[in-house]
């Protein structure tokens, strides 16, 4: 074989390795940015900094959520919320409630104390 036209296998492997590392690093930075963005929201930070009351959260849940999710979160029109805190992070639950991105669930942004109470109640289901 002619050494001038045959690429050195070590150089090819090194180039591919560098490309893979660069892609993985870019993905890691993207995911880190997404994670930080979720926690940067002042509303989310305020809710997470507030101590919730599960009793008040139950009342808020029954008034606003119980019709679709069942009075005890066992699901009716909306999905069951039993063990929801094991399936979703606190931030994901807050964003699910306030976003309105899952029709037919309406957008709902209670004040931070009420959201902290609701979150505390959901953690008991």
Language model segments and positions:
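N-terminal membrane topogenic signal
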Residues: 10-16
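Hydrophobic membrane-insertion alpha-helices, especially the h-region
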Residues: 16-32
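Hydrophobic alpha-helical segments
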Residues: 30, 54-55, 75
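Electrostatic cytochrome c docking/interface patches
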Residues: 34-60
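Sequence context surrounding c-type heme c attachment/ligation sites in exported
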Residues: 55-63, 86-91
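The canonical Cys-X-X-Cys-His
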Residues: 57, 61-71, 118-122
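Extracytoplasmic electron-transfer domains, predominantly the class I c-type cytochrome c fold
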Residues: 72, 76, 82-125
């Amino acid at each position: 074989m002619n050494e001038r036209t045959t690429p050195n296998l070590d150089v090819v492997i090194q180039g591919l390795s560098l490309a893979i590392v660069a892609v993985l690093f870019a993905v890691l930075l993207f995911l880190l940015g997404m994670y930080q963005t979720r926690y940067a929201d002042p509303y989310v930070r305020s809710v997470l900094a507030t101590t919730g009351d599960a009793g008040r959260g139950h009342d808020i849940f029954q008034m606003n959520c119980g019709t679709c999710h069942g009075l005890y979160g066992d699901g009716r029109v909306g999905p069951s919320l039993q063990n929801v805190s094991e399936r979703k992070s606190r931030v994901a639950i807050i964003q699910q409630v306030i976003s309105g991105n899952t029709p037919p669930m309406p957008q709902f942004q209670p004040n931070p104390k009420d959201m902290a109470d609701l979150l505390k109640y959901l953690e008991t289901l």
